[in-house]
Amino acid sequence: MALTKPKKIPRYRRNKPEIRKVDKGIIHIRASFNNTIITVTNVLGCVISWSSAGACGFKGPKKGSAFAAQKATENVIRMVVINRATVLITGCGKGRDAALRVIHQNYIPIHAVLDVTPTPHNGCRPPVKRRI
């Protein structure tokens, strides 16, 4: 059985992403060394929009760069209009400051910036270091 290719839709007929309005929102920034993921939720925690460096077209080690985090944040902000935002930052990657800078440059009123990176209080024993 032969597979049929889906028809290509011309650019002028493609659906444009709809802009969603939120009164109070939470912007979650997860910045790891390998990627940066930005998620916008409402106060209840329902996801409104999200983007990541990988979803923006960056591959390999470029996903962990500050520029990739900047572009991912711009993609999310383009989809959402927020009247008041709380920013929760997790992780210690290069995209932390870049994403926060983009939010500030786009005139989104920031209510609070919180660092919620999990830190152990001497919990699990770390793995043994490799000897090469």
Curated annotation (Swiss-Prot):
GO molecular function of the protein, one example? rRNA binding
GO BP annotations listed: translation
Q: Which GO terms describe its cellular component?
A: chloroplast; ribonucleoprotein complex; ribosome
Localization per Swiss-Prot or TrEMBL: Plastid, Chloroplast
Q: Which InterPro entries match?
A: Ribosomal_uS11, Ribosomal_uS11_sf
What does the UniProt keyword field contain?
Chloroplast, Plastid, Ribonucleoprotein, Ribosomal protein, RNA-binding, rRNA-binding
Q: Name one Pfam family in it.
A: Ribosomal_S11
Q: What is its main location?
A: plastid
Q: Which family does it belong to?
A: Belongs to the universal ribosomal protein uS11 family.
Q: How does it assemble?
A: Part of the 30S ribosomal subunit.
**Annotated HAMAP family:** Ribosomal_uS11
Q: What is this protein called?
A: Small ribosomal subunit protein uS11c
* Provenance organism: Gnetum parvifolium
